[in-house]
Amino acid sequence: MSDTWSSIQAHKKQLDSLRERLQRRRKQDSGHLDLRNPEAALSPTFRSDSPVPTAPTSGGPKPSTASAVPELATDPELEKKLLHHLSDLALTLPTDAVSICLAISTPDAPATQDGVESLLQKFAAQELIEVKRGLLQDDAHPTLVTYADHSKLSAMMGAVAEKKGPGEVAGTVTGQKRRAEQDSTTVAAFASSLVSGLNSSASEPAKEPAKKSRKHAASDVDLEIESLLNQQSTKEQQSKKVSQEILELLNTTTAKEQSIVEKFRSRGRAQVQEFCDYGTKEECMKASDADRPCRKLHFRRIINKHTDESLGDCSFLNTCFHMDTCKYVHYEIDACMDSEAPGSKDHTPSQELALTQSVGGDSSADRLFPPQWICCDIRYLDVSILGKFAVVMADPPWDIHMELPYGTLTDDEMRRLNIPVLQDDGFLFLWVTGRAMELGRECLNLWGYERVDEIIWVKTNQLQRIIRTGRTGHWLNHGKEHCLVGVKGNPQGFNQGLDCDVIVAEVRSTSHKPDEIYGMIERLSPGTRKIELFGRPHNVQPNWITLGNQLDGIHLLDPDVVARFKQRYPDGIISKPKNL
């Protein structure tokens, strides 16, 4: 569509140029009638607006062979047929001269392609039609008609029908000669302007390659300029180099950071054993096509009399509450080691040896204070007697509207807890779940903490797979829990960047949080006093004081804490205050 429109606009510009030249020649020259072509003077007035190809006079300059237009006699019948064919509304455009010639040719009056193309150029000059190639003639590429003005073509057909016949021309030759003398100037101007137009048209194809070459050269220059503008200057390169060096220095670990990492690195062999991806020993040998299983840890199926293996594995596995009657398959650790395996003793050092390597290998290891705990109702304990702590961790019994095997606290009771007295500067780790996630954030702000991080515990089952069936969650089964991390004041002496905020660990009993959290906190703040609220017997840890109502009595070793506790509670009984 764009090529057709470009051709139309180019043709219109060419016609405008021819008209301008014709008007200038009319004002400047006074031409004479071409005696060798008297028929030009006898043409109807409606044809006088377009230049008709004529042969040059003997005295005038001869055009070049490439631009010469052969003189063709106009056939009135052919012109009439061509006008009728072009004025047909059913004609599909664009169409070429060859197709038109075949359409209007008859056995009695065959039409030639040269005659058709000559008439098409004539009609194009009269603005009856629009052609793609302008005024040039080329046998290899016939003229292409792109547009036809049906109203002008119909008027032209009427004028041709009223035209006088050849026999009447002789009787009116005197009047025609008089008219020819009056229009001699116009005819001469037509001829001269046509020759100049053909010469300029013939030179246009030769100019097109030159224009294209200039455009290509200009585009190459633009590309070179753009590439030069995109290149960095020497100053920019130096600035970028300095920025890269600063970034490398910032990313390089300092000697202190390397010392801290080395301090917490495991001594000797790692005290963990990796699970096999195939689960049981049978599946491991089948997958590896070997005679014996790999050295990793495997599971053994528990098949009881009531077990139906076709049902598959139990969704709860080792946390199933009805394992003695459950018909699904359960598992246990296959602790039977292959004693005949070569080098097995080298790969399984004894626990005593490993502990000796761990403790004796690091003479600068901090000594841990033994665990301490108090069995009490935290709502009524005066926690101010315990002193200040660097880290506080709490796993509150949130009221999440579920049936739980332990008592819960209301939202107001959680807000009234005297947590701020435990710390001036330090961190608070608060476990939340369900709707308590928003309440936990509210409590952090109420107690004077700013939330700075959030640890995610991704729960796995006994087979080390992501759990898909849990006992928590309203619309979706919960496969993770959150631990909000808040900071208070301006804590100093804490290690940064040693651990990430994701823990992947196996679920155990209800509300039993992963033990990995203790190692993470100890690396964050080694050798400092820490306290855990709402703890249970499995939560007691070295360097920690654990508070909870499920602990076994009172076990305090710090002399200062023991003195303050005896002063506050002489009989050792923590009861509900009378004012509550």
From Swiss-Prot:
Modification sites for Phosphoserine: S2, S43, S48, S50, S219, S243, S350
Binding sites annotated in the UniProt record for S-adenosyl-L-methionine: D377, I378, D395, K513, R536, P537, H538, N539, N549, Q550
Swiss-Prot/TrEMBL GO biological process terms: cellular response to UV; circadian rhythm; DNA damage response; dosage compensation by inactivation of X chromosome; endothelial to hematopoietic transition; forebrain radial glial cell differentiation; gliogenesis; innate immune response
Effect of S50A: Does not affect nuclear localization, interaction with METTL14 or WTAP or catalytic activity
Protein name listed in UniProt: N(6)-adenosine-methyltransferase catalytic subunit METTL3
Region annotation Disordered: where it falls in the sequence: 1-70, 198-219
Regulation affecting activity: Methyltransferase activity is regulated by miRNAs via a sequence pairing mechanism. Methyltransferase activity is inhibited by sumoylation.
Gene assigned in the entry: METTL3
Assembly notes: Heterodimer; heterodimerizes with METTL14 to form an antiparallel heterodimer that constitutes an active methyltransferase. Component of the WMM complex, a N6-methyltransferase complex composed of a catalytic subcomplex, named MAC, and of an associated subcomplex, named MACOM. The MAC subcomplex is composed of METTL3 and METTL14. The MACOM subcomplex is composed of WTAP, ZC3H13, CBLL1/HAKAI, VIRMA, and, in some cases of RBM15 (RBM15 or RBM15B). Interacts with NCBP1/CBP80. Interacts with EIF4E. Interacts with EIF3B.
Site positions per UniProt: Interaction with METTL14: E438, R441
Residues annotated with N-acetylserine modification: S2
